[in-house]
Amino acid sequence: MSRKESRVQAFQTLFQLEMKDSDLTINEAISFIKDDNPDLDFEFIHWLVSGVKGHEPVLDETISPYLKDWTIARLLKTDRIILRMATYEILHSDTPAKVVMNEAVELTKQFSDDDHYKFINGVLSNIKK
């Protein structure tokens, strides 16, 4: 399957891990999707989920200056996860920032409120500079 679908699954895994009642490990959360999606790029999913979870404070510090009158904690959970994922991938992969940003916008359109993709795109545009 495509990298795009792997990003969707990484997002859903991170969302699951963010639930207050969740005591799942990263590997346990990822294992839930393996049985139903054997063609996904699980190496990429694990890299992205582990990277985001392992670097949350640094990612939040990177994102925060561009939030304009917002804090990370006030963002919708979906937006916070998407920003962290995209920021991590922009900073730690060879994938062109433009591709990562486009995928983040598409995730936002799929999982967040109607116009939030504009906000996500604006924040990521500043981060990639």
Swiss-Prot record:
GO CC term, one of those recorded: cytosol
Keyword Mitochondrion: no
Keywords: RNA-binding, Transcription, Transcription antitermination, Transcription regulation
Gene3D superfamilies documented for this protein: NusB-like (1.10.940.10)
Domain of life: Bacteria
A Pfam family annotated for this UniProt entry: NusB
The family this protein is said to belong to: Belongs to the NusB family.
Protein name: Transcription antitermination protein NusB
